[in-house]
Amino acid sequence: MDTTMIKTGDLRWSWQGQTIELGFDEAGHGPLVLLLPALSSISTRGEMRPLMERLAARFRVVAIDWPGFGTAPRPAVTWTPDALSSFLAHVFGNVVRDVHGVVAAGHAATYLLHYIAQHPGMIGRAALIAPTWRGPLPTMAGGQRPFFQALRRAVETPGI
């Protein structure tokens, strides 16, 4: 897929009297698939881009950032499970409609499962994945480095 076909936009959500601005990416045509990145200080919707590019050949794909994460400024808000659940409900109620499927990474899967339990039949399919399994160092450093393997062995070695 030609990455110039990815459209970037902003969405707004209000929580406890604050308007929070977040980013989203959209590509493709067809049934809607929502991509939810992991909730991590280094995770953004950008980590979903390779998957978005593959799916966009058959689906309309939307990837969003979570509030307090991603590329937008982080407002001084306590990000509780209630806040993040409310955000996800806002996404399904106001940002995306008629969702064919959702891919949720890491802890985002927990919020998706909670939403599905509260709204049976609203989501056609769900795929729960953990793309940040490799840990934060390669993501922060822009790729693997030779010393990461030795560092991982040192961290995983039981202490005396």
Regions found by a protein language model. Give the residues of each.
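Conserved HGGG/HGGXW glycine-rich cap/lid loop of the alpha/beta-hydrolase fold
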Residues: 16-71
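Active-site loop/oxyanion-hole signature of alpha/beta-hydrolase fold enzymes
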Residues: 63-103
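Short, hydrophobic alpha-helix immediately C-terminal to the catalytic nucleophile
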Residues: 49, 89, 113-117
